[in-house]
Amino acid sequence: MMQKLQMYVYIYLFMLIAAGPVDLNEGSEREENVEKEGLCNACAWRQNTRYSRIEAIKIQILSKLRLETAPNISKDAIRQLLPRAPPLRELIDQYDVQRDDSSDGSLEDDDYHATTETIITMPTESDFLMQADGKPKCCFFKFSSKIQYNKVVKAQLWIYLRPVKTPTTVFVQILRLIKPMKDGTRYTGIRSLKLDMSPGTGIWQSIDVKTVLQNWLKQPESNLGIEIKALDENGHDLAVTFPGPGEDGLNPFLEVKVTDTPKRSRRDFGLDCDEHSTESRCCRYPLTVDFEAFGWDWIIAPKRYKANYCSGECEFVFLQKYPHTHLVHQANPRGSAGPCCTPTKMSPINMLYFNGKEQIIYGKIPAMVVDRCGCS
């Protein structure tokens, strides 16, 4: 019996020697390696989530703006089309780049498509605007369908008057084209005003055309265009209707403002993390979208904005949007897939952009910024 016991001891010692020295810290190192591996996996997961979020944003913007593809407008074309006018400069200069704040309330329940606030429409030529001498007259405006279904708050016609060398009085007249009358009349007056100009640079002048626009929207067939005249005391026309050399961006244009209906908001809470965070739970991470990196020159402003994204694990009862989510899992743990880390609070961004018809639109795109993340 003793011999058998000694034999077992020898065999055990031989196995220990064959296995090599025993490291007392081996268990802790293994746990540390597992932890590091988990962190690496979390980083890779977040990287994939970032990429997916950016691709989703590109698709959402085109869809919400009702664009099948990104407008193909070159930088040279943009430089020619972009008016050097006060209302547009004001939008760009005072543009409120999307802030990453944590204010109470948000547009959680929001319409899918963009809400238009301001539309800047450039003139186009029309066959009807032809005089007997064959010279086209400005201007004919085609209106976006967005104006048709929104209440017009303001409509301004902006015209640029060339500089003068001496003080002069300018008589501005806006005429609306109509179908030829029996007496040959083809125009009816819209607005007329008198301006005193001093030597120096040219000036932009705005004219209220809200009533005319509303009539055009009610009776589209009556929209045959307008003619602009701005004559000085010597009979010289100072209005830029067809820009010449060095007059890019001085075309006449219409600035139309429409109503925007605010929606109710609700509060929510969640975790905020940075890219170096070791937080494994559902959290909001920063993400800046750069439109110039996409080659999307058709977006005038903002050139970039903070979109953010959600990533992390969802333990049951942690940041769940709906209380019943936990109860459903408890009742049927195998039949429930469990909660996922998703945005629970989002807010819109304002955007100034060219649409497919080369019109400049200033509108609000809903649900483009992740403000809070949670499990649902």
From Swiss-Prot:
Residue ranges listed under propeptide: 25-267
Database matches in Pfam families: TGF_beta, TGFb_propeptide
Site (Cleavage): residue numbering on this chain: 99-100
Phenotype of the disrupted gene, per the record: Mutant animals exhibit muscle hypertrophy.
Keywords: Cleavage on pair of basic residues, Cytokine, Disulfide bond, Glycoprotein, Growth factor, Heparin-binding, Secreted, Signal
Example of a GO MF term: heparin binding
Gene Ontology terms: biological process: cellular response to dexamethasone stimulus; cellular response to hypoxia; muscle cell cellular homeostasis; myoblast migration involved in skeletal muscle regeneration; negative regulation of insulin receptor signaling pathway; negative regulation of kinase activity; negative regulation of muscle hypertrophy; negative regulation of myoblast differentiation
Chief location category: secreted
Record-linked CDD domains: TGF_beta_GDF8
Cleaved signal peptide residues: 1-24
List of glycosylated residues: 72
Post-translational events: Synthesized as large precursor molecule that undergoes proteolytic cleavage to generate an N-terminal propeptide and a disulfide linked C-terminal dimer, which is the biologically active molecule. The circulating form consists of a latent complex of the C-terminal dimer and other proteins, including its propeptide, which maintain the C-terminal dimer in a latent, inactive state. Ligand activation requires additional cleavage of the prodomain by a tolloid-like metalloproteinase.
Compartments, as annotated in UniProt: Secreted
Disulfide links within the chain: 273-283, 282-341, 310-373, 314-375
Keyword Thylakoid belongs to the record: no
Gene Ontology cellular component annotations, sorted alphabetically: extracellular region; extracellular space
Effect of residue 100 to A: Blocks proteolytic cleavage; increases muscle mass when injected into adult mice
PROSITE patterns attached to this UniProt entry: TGF_BETA_1, TGF_BETA_2
Tissue spec. comment: Expressed specifically in developing and adult skeletal muscle. Weak expression in adipose tissue.
Stated family: Belongs to the TGF-beta family.
UniProt subunit comment: Homodimer; disulfide-linked. Interacts with WFIKKN2, leading to inhibit its activity. Interacts with FSTL3.
Function of the molecule: Acts specifically as a negative regulator of skeletal muscle growth.
Name of protein: Growth/differentiation factor 8
Protein encoded by which gene: Mstn
